[in-house]
């Protein structure tokens, strides 16, 4: 199999260190992976750049759910993007949609300008646009480096047909990065089915967080009531298995 670029979705400084140990050369740096990945702290970015050799794509996403942002959220994203670029991020990951689900080119252009020569990655907002191939053409025209997609399906394996069409449509003008539900069992299949030369995945495990055990009736999250006595972290063995499966 051809040389495959490995990008791991990291939710912390520790995740990034483990991703490098597993064999990744690039990460998408986030916080709150449970929510699909939100903007990381500046401190996290600075530590990752200081103590690893990873290419770091910094997520710019201030909240969960969709991608039609208020003016307050948009201003926050602009400031976060500037801080990330000024502090060594190798690229920005973001996406803006209008109310109708089409790409908001004007807002995208603002962050593209901030990123300058660094990578500009349009995230999985592409997976909810009404016409993904038309949207891909627009991303190419805007100057995006790469687009992350599951092929408008819950997993990249299920969306392999559309991902393959996107690779063909791109013709090398933009990189197509499959992500979503990639595991050691399907990673190589996705590569073969789509013709991509890179993959994006998270490989997590739960780790005990003992400090809350005195009162297990307390929850700090929302209605989903996530467990407070454990946290999701990157699993070195889990990441390594995916990479070795290629």
From Swiss-Prot:
Localisation: Cytoplasm
UniProt entry keywords in alphabetical sequence: Cytoplasm
Entry annotated with the keyword RNA-binding: no
Keyword Cytoplasm among UniProt keywords: yes
Domain of life: Bacteria
Pfam families membership: CutC
MF (Gene Ontology): copper ion binding
Cellular compartments per GO CC: cytoplasm
HAMAP family linked: CutC (MF_00795)
Entry's family note: Belongs to the CutC family.
The name this protein goes by in its record: PF03932 family protein CutC
Species per Swiss-Prot/TrEMBL record: Treponema denticola (strain ATCC 35405 / DSM 14222 / CIP 103919 / JCM 8153 / KCTC 15104)
């Amino acid at each position: 199999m051809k040389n495959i670029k490995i990008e791991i979705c990291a939710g912390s400084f520790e995740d990034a260190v483990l991703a490098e140990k597993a064999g990744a050369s690039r990460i998408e740096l986030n916080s709150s992976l449970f929510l699909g990945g939100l903007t990381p702290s500046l401190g996290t970015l600075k530590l990752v750049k200081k103590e690893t050799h990873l290419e770091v794509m910094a997520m710019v996403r201030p909240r969960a759910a969709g991608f039609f942002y208020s003016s307050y959220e948009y201003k926050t994203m602009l400031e976060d993007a500037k801080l990330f670029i000024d502090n060594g991020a190798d690229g920005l990951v973001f996406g803006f949609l209008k109310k109708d689900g089409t790409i908001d080119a004007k807002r995208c252009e603002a962050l593209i300008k901030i990123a300058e020569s660094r990578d500009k990655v349009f995230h999985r907002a592409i997976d909810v646009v009404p016409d993904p191939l038309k949207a891909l053409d627009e991303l190419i025209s805007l100057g995006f480096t790469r687009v992350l997609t599951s092929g408008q399906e819950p997993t990249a394996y299920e969306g392999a047909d559309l991902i393959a069409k996107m690779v063909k449509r791109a013709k090398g003008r933009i990189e197509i990065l499959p992500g979503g539900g990639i595991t050691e069992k399907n990673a190589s299949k996705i590569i073969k089915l789509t013709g991509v030369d890179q993959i994006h995945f998270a490989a997590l495990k739960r780790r005990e967080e003992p400090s809350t055990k005195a009162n297990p009736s307390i929850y700090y999250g929302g209605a989903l009531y996530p467990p407070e006595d454990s946290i999701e972290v990157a699993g070195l063995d889990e990441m390594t298995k995916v990479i070795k499966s290629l």
